[in-house]
């Protein structure tokens, strides 16, 4: 959320599943965030550079490659945004790979709206905390 008078926080969501995108957009906009959407790895990486979001939420499995490329692109920025990785295929290996690439929070799909909001707020507040949630 934004302090009074401040510009809305910018959240880039990278996911190819329409239902999840609609949920992210509705929830985040309702809570005052400006939402930017990408549906492929390539578009996600380009949006990280072009839009300079405050937060990136990226699925791991994208139609043209790994969401880890989006994570790496985000974390390589001069002022890197926090990154939440989401996946419908959670495992110890995927969690470790996401955190090693620079994700700050790892969420397993499906998750409750309250869990996503808590992760978003934590990421924007703490920046570099590393957490796992389900």
Predicted regions: what they are:
Residues 15, 59, 87:
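Active-site residues of response regulator receiver
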Residues 18-36:
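Two-component/phosphorelay signaling modules centered on CheY-like receiver
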Residues 21, 63, 91:
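The feature encodes the CheY-like receiver
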Residues 40-43, 66-69:
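Acidic catalytic/metal-coordinating carboxylates
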Residues 51-57, 62:
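Active-site beta3 strand of CheY-like receiver
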Residues 69, 90-107:
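Alpha4 helix (beta4-alpha4-beta5 surface) of REC/receiver domains from two-component response regulators
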Residues 80-90:
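A short, hydrophobic beta-strand element within the central beta-sheet of small alpha/beta folds
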Residues 93, 111-121:
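C-terminal output helix
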């Amino acid at each position: 959320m934004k302090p009074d008078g401040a510009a809305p926080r910018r959240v880039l969501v990278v996911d190819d599943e329409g239902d999840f995108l609609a949920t992210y957009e509705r929830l985040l906009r309702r809570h005052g965030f400006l939402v930017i959407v990408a549906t492929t790895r390539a578009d996600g990486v380009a949006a990280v550079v072009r839009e300079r979001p405050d937060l990136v939420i990226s699925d791991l499995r994208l139609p043209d490659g790994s969401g880890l490329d989006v994570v790496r692109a985000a974390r390589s920025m001069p002022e890197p945004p926090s990154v939440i990785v989401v996946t419908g295929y959670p495992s110890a290996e995927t969690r470790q790979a996401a955190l090693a690439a620079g994700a700050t929070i790892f969420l397993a799909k499906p998750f409750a709206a309250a869990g996503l909001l808590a992760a978003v707020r934590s990421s924007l507040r703490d920046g570099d905390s590393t957490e796992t949630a389900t």
